[in-house]
């Protein structure tokens, strides 16, 4: 079930919800994992028009279906706010430099 498409990766709403839950759990505990210390603040330099406001945080969502645990984050991210509301999915796939584009 393809609720979101990031490049060639397909994600169901439940996979997105699971990833968001894992990321928010660490955020609310003040913890992070990996070299880039996820979840970390996402400043929305790209100017995406997210359906929720707030301070945004990015967390890797893995096409393998596994929960991110500190290894390679891949290209795809779940973005949530400090109230645990989903802002959307973004990806480095198809973006220039270190930028992001919205997932479909």
From Swiss-Prot:
It catalyses: [RNA] containing guanosine + H2O = an [RNA fragment]-3'-guanosine-3'-phosphate + a 5'-hydroxy-ribonucleotide-3'-[RNA fragment]. GO terms for cellular component: extracellular region. Its main location: secreted. Keywords: Disulfide bond, Endonuclease, Hydrolase, Lyase, Nuclease, Secreted. It is found in: Secreted. It holds the Pfam family Ribonuclease. It is an enzyme of class 4 (lyase). Disulfide bonds join 2-10, 6-103. Its EC number is 4.6.1.24. The active site is at 40, 58 (proton acceptor), 92 (proton donor). One of its GO terms (molecular function) is RNA endonuclease activity. PANTHER family: EXTRACELLULAR GUANYL-SPECIFIC RIBONUCLEASE RNTA (AFU_ORTHOLOGUE AFUA_4G03230). Belongs to the ribonuclease N1/T1 family. This is Guanyl-specific ribonuclease Ap1. It comes from Aspergillus pallidus. The lineage of its organism: Eukaryota, Fungi, Dikarya, Ascomycota, Pezizomycotina.
